[in-house]
Amino acid sequence: MKEEREKKEEVFEEEEFGELLKYTLAGYAGGLGLGWLLDKLGFQQNPIGEWLVRTLAGEGESILEGIFAVKKRLTGAVSSLAQAYGWGKLIGMTVPWWIDLFSRLLGVNVYGWEGFYIPYFYAMSDQIGANVSGFIYLYKKEGNFSKAVKRYFTNPVMLTSLLVILLVPIGLLVARLLGFSPTTNFYAALETVAANLCWLPPLVGMLVEKKKGSD
């Protein structure tokens, strides 16, 4: 009975991680497209414009993934790691809005190296939320903290997520120190897209589930 349930979950997760990957690409396209349009309209270095393009480029998929998780819950689908991932991303997506706002109010140069953390949180706060939510899912499934930790560090999706969370801020800081400055909406979107490696964990999840299915 347990093996049958686990196989059913694997089928769901392969399909669901594939959907999450599509949502990420849609967010990229939306952010870059809106950035280009706002620049054409003359809204460079506009806080609201930058908020919109960073939200779409870094978190557009979170909105769609949150809707995906709600839809799956309402239809009574089997609870899965992909759904937990979607819920976590939706919850974490508002954090960078406040970080961006208070950074500007405090006079931080958001276009210099000092503001490297702003695109990081737009790109990664939902990923951090997804990582935490994924661990909670594993804990509930295992019913034991030490077993959940063991599952976490043997789960390729969770490990990829953790690696992305730790490496992205280093890349952003280096780029800013080398002279990159997001002075246009398109550049702001491009920087956020480059930092938004949230597609990697779903891709790993999809590939792993496909490999399991072929074995």
From Swiss-Prot:
Stretches that traverse the bilayer: 77-99, 117-139, 152-174, 189-208
Domain of life: Bacteria
Keyword NAD part of the UniProt annotation: no
GO CC annotation, single: plasma membrane
Bilayer topology: Multi-pass membrane protein
Keyword set, alphabetical order: Cell membrane, Membrane, Transmembrane, Transmembrane helix
Protein name: Uncharacterized protein aq_473
Organism field: Aquifex aeolicus (strain VF5)
